[in-house]
């Protein structure tokens, strides 16, 4: 199976997960609206709320809050991702070291190969661990960050494959997707938890009581459901980025070697006390946690090895 077909299949999976998120998000808001209007019949109330015969106030507020939070995150996300470490912008208009010139040159080669008309900002993070991540809401404010240890220990092709992987995340809008899903998840959990307690003591009609019971069940189920969906979504995007890197490189071997070196580095060293920025853990090229949003290195390498260019 070629890489373009793999990417297309994973996009379909992503759309299915994102649709599921939006449906659950709206359903929770509608349930709270059913309780708010003290409905006698759950089905009839949901129909009237969905068709705006009754205005779904809580549902609309939830979507507005999500929108505001997303806007705030867009403005500050890159600075949050870079926080906690000393970092340097590779500015081609200034004098660069030979290594910085090489990294910038690799990025330009990939941009030409992919026929892209934008250039992400390139950062070096001064850190002893080997990793990389991409950030930015869209192409115009995107960035790619590489740790100094990664730059020192990978050869030219491996480094280019890592940059290609992060560039693929930007091309596939993965950062935007991850941010939106994370925000929707948190708002869903907050509304499901607090609405149950807020309405618990009030006398309600049968439809409202049924909505309350469903919310009580969701209060237990949602944390596990959102975790599973987020892990599935993120792992799908990682496979896509790996495929995108191999496609741009016309070879999967450099990406495989890079993953092996990074994995071995984390096996030999414990960086938990050094790398304290938890916000960017989901965006890393490699995540060593047991319940990681990333597939295992073994599965990623097997997936890359099976695929034909």
Swiss-Prot record:
Please give one Gene Ontology molecular function term for this protein.
Answer: zinc ion binding
Requisite cofactors: Zn(2+)
Q: Where in the cell is it found?
A: Cell inner membrane
Matches recorded under Gene3D superfamilies: Metalloproteases ('zincins'), catalytic domain
The catalytic activity of this protein is classed by the Enzyme Commission as: 3.4.24.-
Q: What are its GO cellular component terms?
A: plasma membrane
Any idea which residues are catalytic in this one? 166
The residues that the entry says bind Zn(2+) are 165, 169, 238
Which residue pairs form cystines in this protein?
A: none
Q: Where are the transmembrane segments?
A: 15-35, 54-74, 181-201, 213-233
Indicate how the chain sits in the lipid bilayer: Multi-pass membrane protein
- One of the protein's GO biological processes: proteolysis
Record keywords, A-Z: Cell inner membrane, Cell membrane, Hydrolase, Membrane, Metal-binding, Metalloprotease, Protease, Transmembrane, Transmembrane helix, Zinc
What does the record's cofactor remark say about binding?
Answer: Binds 1 zinc ion per subunit.
According to its UniProt record, what is one Pfam family this protein matches?
Peptidase_M48
Q: Does the keyword Repressor apply?
A: no
Q: Report the PANTHER family cross-referenced here.
A: PROTEASE HTPX (PTHR43221:SF1)
The name on file for this protein is Protease HtpX homolog
| Organism listed in the record | Helicobacter acinonychis (strain Sheeba)
Instruction: State the encoding gene.
Output: htpX
């Amino acid at each position: 199976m070629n890489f373009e077909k793999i990417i297309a299949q994973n996009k379909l999976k992503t759309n299915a997960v994102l649709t599921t998120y939006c449906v659950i998000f709206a359903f929770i808001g509608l349930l709270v609206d059913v309780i708010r209007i003290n409905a006698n019949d759950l089905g009839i109330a949901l129909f009237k709320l969905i068709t705006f015969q009754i205005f779904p106030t809580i549902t609309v507020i939830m979507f507005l809050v999500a929108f505001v939070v997303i806007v705030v995150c867009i403005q500050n996300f890159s600075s949050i991702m870079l926080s906690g470490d000393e970092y340097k912008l590779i500015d081609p208009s200034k004098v660069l070291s030979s290594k910085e010139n090489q990294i910038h040159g690799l990025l330009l080669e990939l941009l030409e190969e992919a026929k892209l008309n934008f250039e992400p900002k390139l950062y070096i993070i001064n850190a002893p661990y080997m990793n990389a991540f991409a950030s930015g809401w869209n192409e115009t404010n995107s960035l790619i960050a590489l740790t100094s240890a990664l730059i020192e220990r990978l050869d030219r092709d491996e480094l280019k494959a890592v940059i290609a992987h992060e560039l693929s995340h930007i091309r596939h809008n993965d950062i935007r997707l991850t941010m939106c899903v994370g925000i929707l998840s948190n708002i869903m959990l907050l509304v499901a938890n607090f609405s149950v307690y807020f309405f618990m003591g009030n006398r309600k009609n049968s439809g409202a009581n049924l909505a309350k019971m469903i919310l009580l069940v969701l209060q237990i189920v949602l944390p596990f459901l959102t975790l599973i969906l987020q892990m599935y979504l993120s792992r799908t995007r990682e496979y896509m980025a790996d495929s995108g890197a191999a496609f741009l490189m016309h070879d999967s071997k450099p990406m495989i070697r890079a993953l092996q070196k990074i994995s071995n580095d984390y096996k030999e060293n414990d960086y938990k006390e050094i790398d304290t920025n938890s916000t960017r853990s989901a965006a890393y090229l490699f995540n060593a946690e047991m319940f990681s949003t990333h597939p295992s290195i073994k599965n990623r390498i097997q997936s890359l090895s099976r695929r034909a260019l």
